[in-house]
């Protein structure tokens, strides 16, 4: 929004305000909270004989809300401190786990890569226009995953204090590469080489859980649950900063922190809506 209002001039300020209004409503923790709860139910509670329920999800939601409140009410410094400590270690742990799965199914790696290419550019897909739809869906998922081109990441990177802005720019460029090209690609490959995509009706996080359980029976699902918890939680606290900056731009930095109250409340509301 500052690039629009300062770089393009005040006459474009309505566009900057529209961006902030959209960001205010889009920067919500509902998806991440649901994924954390879904992973907990799939990995911990259902194997123990406890089915998912509204009351159980609300209890987990309250715990998540409390942890989120502790972090986001501490400001950008506390958010950055948590993210800097947790994310690199979790990325490394996740990549090591996926690497072990790929080594176990090493003979299926090349056939899986060939399958990806063949299905993407098959004659039937081209004639049916499916390639365009797949590319569009991939672009949407990539933008949701790494925020490339959306305009939100500059809020976080712009808040850093560094003597070398170029280095911060390089860090910003590495984000999409690590997130989408490395983590997401290896996750998809992990699902393919284990074969769970053929034998299971699950999707999303549940399908990834089955891939980990199949190859790493004792630790796989718990490693994945821990990684999902950390990734989801750090994303939740990061999104809160975006929403706060958007509200601050509209009504002033003095009142922007009120966004935090709405943000932590929407976690419980979102978990309640999925049971309606």
Please name every model-derived segment.
Residues 8-12, 225-228, 232-270:
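C-terminal membrane-solvent junction of multi-pass transporters and transport-like membrane proteins
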Residues 71, 142-147, 151-165, 172-176:
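Helix-loop junctions at the membrane interface of multi-pass solute transporters
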Residues 5-34, 38-71, 226-236, 269:
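Helix-loop-helix module between adjacent transmembrane segments
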Residues 97-115, 158-162, 174, 178-205:
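Extracellular/periplasmic helix-exit of transmembrane alpha-helices
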Residues 275-276:
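Conserved small/polar residues in nucleotide/adenosyl-binding loops
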Residues 78-139:
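Helix-loop-helix hairpins and the membrane-proximal interhelical loops
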Residues 6, 10-18, 51-52, 162-177, ...:
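Membrane-interface alpha-helices at helix entry/exit sites of multi-pass transporters
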Residues 1-26, 208-224, 248-255:
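Transmembrane-helix boundary/entry motifs in multi-pass membrane transporters
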């Amino acid at each position: 929004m500052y690039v629009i209002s300062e770089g393009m001039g005040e006459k474009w300020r309505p566009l900057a305000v529209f961006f902030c209004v959209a960001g205010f409503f889009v920067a919500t923790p509902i998806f991440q909270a649901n994924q954390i709860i879904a992973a907990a139910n799939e990995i911990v509670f259902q194997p123990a004989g406890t089915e998912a329920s509204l009351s159980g999800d609300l209890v987990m939601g309250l715990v998540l809300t409390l942890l989120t409140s502790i972090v986001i009410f501490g400001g950008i410094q506390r958010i950055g401190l948590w993210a800097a400590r947790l994310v690199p270690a979790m990325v490394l742990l996740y990549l090591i786990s996926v690497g072990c799965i790929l080594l176990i199914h090493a003979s299926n790696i090349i056939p899986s890569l060939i399958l990806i290419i063949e299905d993407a550019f098959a004659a039937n897909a081209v004639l049916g226009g499916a390639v365009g739809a797949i590319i569009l869906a991939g672009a949407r998922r990539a933008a949701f995953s790494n925020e490339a081109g959306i305009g939100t990441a500059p809020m976080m990177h712009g808040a850093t204090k560094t003597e070398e802005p170029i280095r911060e720019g390089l860090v910003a460029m590495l984000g999409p590469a690590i997130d989408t090209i490395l983590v997401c690609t290896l996750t998809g490959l992990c699902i393919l080489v284990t074969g769970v995509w053929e034998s299971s009706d699950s999707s999303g996080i549940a399908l990834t859980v089955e891939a980990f359980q199949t190859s790493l029976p004792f630790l796989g699902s718990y490693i994945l649950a821990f990684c999902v918890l950390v990734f989801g939680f750090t994303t939740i606290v990061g999104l809160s900063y975006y929403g706060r900056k958007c509200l601050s731009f509209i009504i002033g930095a003095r009142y922007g922190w009120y966004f935090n109250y709405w943000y932590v409340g929407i976690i419980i509301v979102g978990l309640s809506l999925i049971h309606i």
